[in-house]
Amino acid sequence: MDWMRLIRDLCFNPRHTKWMAPLLVLGDAFLCALIIWKVPCKATAKLRSHPFATRERDYTLIRGSTGPLVYPAAHVYSYTALYHLTDEGRDIFFGQILFAVLYLITLVVVLCCYRQSGAPPYLLPLLVLSKRLHSVYVLRLFNDGLAALAMWVAILLFMNRKWTAAVAVWSTGVAIKMTLLLLAPAIAVVTVLSLSLGPSVGLGVLAVLVQVLLAIPFLQNNPAGYLSRAFELTRQFMFKWTVNWRFVGEEVFLSKSFSLALLAVHIVLLGAFAVTGWLRYSRSSLPAFIRNLLAGRHRTVSLPKPYIMSVMLSSLTVGLLCARSLHYQFFAYLSWATPFLLWRAGFHPILLYLIWAMQEWAWNTFPSTNLSSIIVVLSLATQSFGVLANSASAFYTMRSNPSGKEHNQ
């Protein structure tokens, strides 16, 4: 039965990722080219009506193809560049090629993260098989593709302890789309455990400075207008576009009590992850950890790469689970995280593939239905609670080493 041992080794031995990953990238490049060739692009208006083409600096007066601009400054710069690179939005084909390259670069970064975390090769095919993910990138040209690249580059940098670069890249991603704020709790935990309180606060200041520097042209003109539009936290979402909460009905979806309930669940889940998983490397109870941290007695820890990736992606998925409304483009953040989280949750490979397929079906159902939205929420809950229930393995399979202070890089 040597062939059985060979198949098992190919599926479970992480050393095979080194040669499998380039083959998957090559195959996916061919698939992207085929999609661009055969499927009409759906993002012509997005390229042809870019708001910054008029050089307007008052954020309250800038409009895009779908109405008032509601994204931060880096989004404006990114799509201004795209607007000019595509001959003022007329060369849609070249725009698709650019987003296909963006997709493939992000895939390479994701594969690097998977390899460094020791993930088994049987997860890798799931990283290139998503119909919805290809649509988000090469057919819809959403800014979420740019933000997702920033997210994964930041995760890779955090895994390799490049703290300053990681925070700068992450904050730039936040300036493309606020979804990346969902990583903030994880970043706080990882940096505090690795560097202690003072350096972590310094990195937080750096993140704010990146936002200020990117927004200077708009802050000089109308700072209140920029902050209210770019970082609007009270935005009312339209029920007809929701992917996740359609099954609760429009009245509940639009109610303030539902929004507050989701916020409360989000806070409780973050606390549960912190107590049962994220902070256990501190080797003390939560009250003792806080006391030691404030008193300057916290002993820094060299965190293993699988732990860092698990903390980052679990923070992301908890945030998506408790989001007021998810739209189809949000799959850019979730799709590549799901296989890893299901693996860390300890699911059998067959069950893992089944959950992935159900999630993929739900996100490809347009418009969303009660059933598809239930599956979206259940799949997110399965990933979040699965990792939480399996926290002993999900966060502690690798030993950490006490160390002195780690320097910013």
Curated annotation (Swiss-Prot):
- List the residue ranges forming a coiled coil, or say none: none
Annotated compartments: Endoplasmic reticulum membrane
What catalytic activity does the UniProt entry give for this protein? an alpha-D-Man-(1->2)-alpha-D-Man-(1->2)-alpha-D-Man-(1->3)-[alpha-D-Man-(1->6)]-beta-D-Man-(1->4)-beta-D-GlcNAc-(1->4)-alpha-D-GlcNAc-diphospho-di-trans,poly-cis-dolichol + a di-trans,poly-cis-dolichyl beta-D-mannosyl phosphate = an alpha-D-Man-(1->2)-alpha-D-Man-(1->2)-alpha-D-Man-(1->3)-[alpha-D-Man-(1->3)-alpha-D-Man-(1->6)]-beta-D-Man-(1->4)-beta-D-GlcNAc-(1->4)-alpha-D-GlcNAc-diphospho-di-trans,poly-cis-dolichol + a di-trans,poly-cis-dolichyl phosphate + H(+)
What is this protein's record name? Dol-P-Man:Man(5)GlcNAc(2)-PP-Dol alpha-1,3-mannosyltransferase
Upper classification of the source organism reads: Eukaryota, Fungi, Dikarya, Ascomycota, Pezizomycotina
Q: What is its membrane topology?
A: Multi-pass membrane protein
All ranges on the Lumenal side of the membrane: 1-18, 83-91, 159-167, 220-257, 324-335, 395-409
Biological process annotations from GO: dolichol-linked oligosaccharide biosynthetic process; protein N-linked glycosylation
Tell me the route in metabolism or biology where this protein functions: Protein modification; protein glycosylation
Reported function: Dol-P-Man:Man(5)GlcNAc(2)-PP-Dol alpha-1,3-mannosyltransferase that operates in the biosynthetic pathway of dolichol-linked oligosaccharides, the glycan precursors employed in protein asparagine (N)-glycosylation. The assembly of dolichol-linked oligosaccharides begins on the cytosolic side of the endoplasmic reticulum membrane and finishes in its lumen. The sequential addition of sugars to dolichol pyrophosphate produces dolichol-linked oligosaccharides containing fourteen sugars, including two GlcNAcs, nine mannoses and three glucoses.
Could you say which protein family the record assigns here? Belongs to the glycosyltransferase ALG3 family.
Report the top EC class in one word: transferase
What Pfam families would the database entry show? ALG3 (PF05208)
Please state the Enzyme Commission number of this protein.
2.4.1.258
List the cysteine pairs that form cystine: none
**Can you quote a single GO CC term?**
endoplasmic reticulum membrane
- Which organism does this record belong to? Aspergillus niger (strain ATCC MYA-4892 / CBS 513.88 / FGSC A1513)
